[in-house]
Amino acid sequence: MGVLNIELHEPEIPANTGNIGRTCVATGTRLHLIEPLGFRLNEKAIKRAGMDYWEHLDVTRYLDYEDFLKKNPGAKIYYATTKAPQTYTDVKYEDDCFIMFGKESAGIPEDILVKNQETCVRIPMIGDIRSLNLSNSVAIVLYEALRQHNFAHMNLEGHLRNYDWK
């Protein structure tokens, strides 16, 4: 299996990006940040949330969405949005695909979504909930993509510190 990619479009909250970075390190996933960012990458909040994993993160920054597209020609991109007509479990995530998430206050711009309806996905929710937390949403969709690939390259068995399972 190739490496999956998480793409954050103009993230605003450093703690969310730090948590997402930690999830990316734990899963062998690349993180792509599309500017402008609502924070500096050296802020304490991002380091605290990412803990000591941030230095191991494979992260790339882009000036804007057009810069991202130019540097990743032909990329297969899934757009995670509350506005999508299908759920995140309805699609098959290809090797090396990108899963894009929008900024916390507004999501992915609709002019991007309308051009990519067939690859827009949503996490089902009840009622009139606006959205889930960004880092939680990334984890939900990313782990579905990893599950579809049988968690290739990941540790599937845990170990007790002071006991044996047998």
Give names to the regions the model predicted.
Residues 1-166:
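Post-transcriptional modification and biogenesis factors for structured RNAs
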